[in-house]
Amino acid sequence: MMLRSQAKNVDLTSQADSRHQQKRKQAEQLDALKNPSEPAAKKQHSKGLTELRAHISGFKIDSAKRDPLGKSRTSRRDVENLPPQKSRYVDPCPHYDYDLEEAGNPDSISDYAQGIFDYYRHREVHFRVRKYLHKHPEVDVKTRAILIDWMVEIQETFELNHETLYNAVKLTDMYLCKTKNVDKNTIQKLACVAIFIAAKYDERSPPLVDDLIYLSGDRFSRDELLAMERELFATVGYDLGSPLSYRYLRRFGRVCRVDMKTLTMGRFILETSLMVYEYAMVSQSRLAAAAFVLAMRMLDKNNEYEWNPVLEKYSGFTGEEVMPLVEHMNHILHFSKDKWAQLTSVRQKYSHEVFFHVASIPMLPDTLKVVDSHTYAPVPMLSYP
């Protein structure tokens, strides 16, 4: 029989061995933390996996083909929708700030006004129209001018906003720019649809479809008009918020604090310019700036109004970038009166008392007159915008 003392010694020895094993295990764990190593594979890799690992480990990246660090890939649409970036800019008229002076006027939204028009200018390139008549054999410069004259008549008939007219013309040009072989039977339907869409975009009560069909002489049915509406929407990408020269002109009139007669004269010049095919390729902001300067000159007693720092500040153009277009717009006023005498909608509209009879104000001498010609002088080469 084992004695109690012997049993006690055995128990103590067992406890000592247990403590020793525990300390050794703790030491091994501590050593593993200090010197970590990859655990051995439980089984040998297959031949295919071994070859794959060898290929991956030997793969090298060509730094010449790799994008620079920190450079993200952006699509064209992403670039078009980026806000305008501020560049080095020297204020040509630092002593005058129209928006600061209008800070107390809630109608002027002076905190945002300049930013809005900066964004408009940034977006102009997105709605750029390029030459398209070569793609439509049945449509020429005169046909387009007749169409725009008729659209002005429709705008007056329904008493639509001016923005609706300008937007409708822009939609028409954008559609023709992106399509081919539009015939004369389709182009009037296109104009009706453009007015219909622009009115739904800008008016409280757009014209009825049946009224548009009636004014077009019942040349197409209701279903045909609605089908054309869907086609125009798809062609322009459902993008209707085009910057308009009419809005730029109103902005220039405000910052220069001109009277309503001067602003109306500018509108008459701009609406006349809508009939000129080549002007569809000119930026809306430049057209507005040129029309504004020409209006100021026509109403100035000495016809000596010049480009000034205020206009440069708020239009973004220098005088050299605008004055050639001013001269050509004056030529167009003469040409439209002499050669397009049957296109009377714009001139009759601005002969009314409500528009200060501005259409009857004497024009400046035409320095670009083309003798015995049925076409106007070439439009000067202009950058965009």
From Swiss-Prot:
Pfam families on file: Cyclin_C (PF02984), Cyclin_N (PF00134)
Q: Region Disordered: start and end of each range? A: 1-48, 63-88
Keyword match Nucleus: yes
Q: Which InterPro entries match?
A: Cyclin, Cyclin-like_dom, Cyclin-like_sf, Cyclin_A/B-like, Cyclin_C-dom, Cyclin_N
Where composition is biased (Basic and acidic residues), the residues are: 17-28, 63-80
Bias regions of kind Polar residues — which residues?
1-16
The alphabetized UniProt keywords are: Cell cycle, Cell division, Cyclin, Meiosis, Mitosis, Nucleus
GO terms, biological process: cell division; centrosome cycle; G1/S transition of mitotic cell cycle; kinetochore organization; meiotic cell cycle; meiotic sister chromatid segregation; mitotic cell cycle; mitotic sister chromatid segregation
SMART domains per UniProt = CYCLIN (SM00385), Cyclin_C (SM01332)
MF-aspect GO terms = cyclin-dependent protein serine/threonine kinase regulator activity
Q: Quick check: keyword Nucleus in the entry?
A: yes
User: Which domain of life does this protein belong to?
Assistant: Eukaryota
Q: What happens when the gene is disrupted?
A: RNAi-mediated knockdown causes a longer meiosis II in 1-cell embryos without affecting meiotic exit timing. In a pam-1 (or282) mutant background, restores normal timing for meiotic exit.
Q: Where in the cell is it found?
A: Nucleus
Q: Name one GO cellular component term.
A: nucleus
Q: Which family does it belong to?
A: Belongs to the cyclin family. Cyclin AB subfamily.
Instruction: Write down the PANTHER family for this protein, in alphabetical order.
Output: CYCLINS
Functional note: Could be involved at the G2/M (mitosis) transition. Interacts with the CDK1 and CDK2 protein kinases. G2/M cyclins accumulate steadily during G2 and are abruptly destroyed at mitosis. Plays a role during oocyte meiosis II.
Q: What is this protein called?
A: G2/mitotic-specific cyclin-B3
Organism (species): Caenorhabditis elegans
